[in-house]
């Protein structure tokens, strides 16, 4: 059996991680297939709707998909998400109870931070991969470049307010492995079952790393 990917390996394998909210469980599998077909394999399925865990369970069965759980805010969500098939977790912030849950569940956690002090506090707890959130209100590219000076060993996935147009500037930062974004999964396209459009969005996002 091969070793599971580390969180850093997962981040580096992606240019963009789509932030997904599933309103209809029937959309989960075709959405995952459409994204993977476009070259986007790492998927963050949030717990913002009641269908989150079910979607993780279904999407993790799609060949080529690397499925994580997003919007982790409660300790009990870690083990439940792991059992559903998530191989990494993402939280909007970091608390001691979430740290404890991540350790006990074994689910690699990408916690959200917004300030240099929060970066340093997470770093003291052993985290070297962090989510700058919300990225644009937090200072965007300028903040990332500034943090990279005193804290060069931290790697980020900025999320929040990023678009296909602004993503290349973030990806050009030395301390950015990937970005998170919701533009790959527009609600109108999902509702219409326009999976071909989502595949095209995924292809454009996957090409950002090679650009």
Specify the residue positions occupied by each region the protein language model found.
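Glycine-rich beta-to-alpha transition loops that act as phosphate-gripper elements at the mouths
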Residues: 21-23, 69-75, 91-95, 111-116, ...
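Glycine-enriched alpha-helix->loop->beta-strand junction motifs that scaffold or abut catalytic
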Residues: 39-41, 62-65, 83-89, 103-110, ...
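Short beta-strand segments at enzyme active-site cores
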Residues: 43-47, 68-69, 91, 112, ...
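Glycine-rich phosphate-binding active-site loops on the catalytic face of alpha/beta enzymes
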Residues: 88-101, 131-141, 174-197
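Histidine/lysine/aspartate-rich catalytic loop segments that bind and position anionic ligands
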Residues: 95-129, 133-138
């Amino acid at each position: 059996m091969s070793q599971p990917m580390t969180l850093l390996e997962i981040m580096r394998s992606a240019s963009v991680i789509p932030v997904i909210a599933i309103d209809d469980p029937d959309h989960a599998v075709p959405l995952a297939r459409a994204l993977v077909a476009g070259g986007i394999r790492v998927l963050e399925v949030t717990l913002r709707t009641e269908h989150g865990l079910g979607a993780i369970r279904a999407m993790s069965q799609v060949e080529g998909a690397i499925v994580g759980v997003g919007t982790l805010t409660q300790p009990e969500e870690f083990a439940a998400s792991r059992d559903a098939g998530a191989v990494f977790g993402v939280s909007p912030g970091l608390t001691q109870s979430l740290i404890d849950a991540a350790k006990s569940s074994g689910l690699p956690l990408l916690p959200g931070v917004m300030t240099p002090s929060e970066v340093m506090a997470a770093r003291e707890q052993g985290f070297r991969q962090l989510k700058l959130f919300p990225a644009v209100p937090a200072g965007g590219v300028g903040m990332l470049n500034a943090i990279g000076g005193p804290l060069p060993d931290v790697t980020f996935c900025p999320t929040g307010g990023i678009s296909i147009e602004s993503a290349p500037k973030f990806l050009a930062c030395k301390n950015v492995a990937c970005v998170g974004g919701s533009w790959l999964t527009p609600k109108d396209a999902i509702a219409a079952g326009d999976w071909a459009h989502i595949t095209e969005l995924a292809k454009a996002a996957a090409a950002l790393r090679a650009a």
